[in-house]
A protein has these predicted regions:
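Terminal targeting signals and extreme-terminal segments of soluble enzymes
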Residues: 1-159
Length: 159
């Protein structure tokens, strides 16, 4: 698939998610009580639970989540630049942390939560706002009882 076709598909995916999602906010404990990670994400995608504010702040959102796998999509802007004129590494890290964290959360039963224990990224190419869209994929490698391991990657429509 060519980059232009991929970009068109990504934009359609994002439009579909944006058309269904709820208000920006944080779900109350009574709203998520009894929901597994996947049930919680489905409720977010259906607009029954609020969309977390971090995505609004940094201009990214989840576009697909299934057990053990999550895809986020975003558009870096000038507000995300560092002093060198490229996208700040924290933007990369936050989007990747969201993808791998949600991949882990998607396999958790009701009543269980997660937090990031360690995050390491390797940035192999600078990113600017000239990139139309970027995706972050997170995948669970090992779903341990106490500590899960996940990996992620960030890429554009050209791969």
């Amino acid at each position: 698939m060519h980059a232009e076709e991929t970009l068109a598909r990504w934009r359609a995916d994002e439009a579909a998610v944006r058309s269904r999602r709820g208000e920006i906010g944080v779900a109350r404990p009574d709203q998520v009580a009894g929901l597994s990670g996947m049930e919680m994400f489905q409720a977010m995608f259906d607009g029954r639970l609020p969309s977390p504010p971090i995505g609004h702040t940094l201009d990214f959102l989840p576009v697909h989540i299934e057990p053990g796998f999550a895809v986020f999509q975003g558009k870096p802007g000038l507000a995300h630049y560092n002093p060198l004129g490229t996208v700040h590494g924290g933007w990369f890290a936050t989007m990747l942390d969201s993808a791998v964290g949600c991949a882990v959360h998607s396999i958790l039963p009701a009543g269980k939560g997660y937090t990031t224990l360690e995050l390491k990224i390797n940035i192999v190419r600078a990113l600017t706002d000239r990139v139309a869209l970027v995706r972050a994929e997170g995948r669970v490698i090992h779903p341990g009882n106490q500590v899960a391991t996940a990996e992620g990657k960030l890429f554009g429509p050209d791969g």
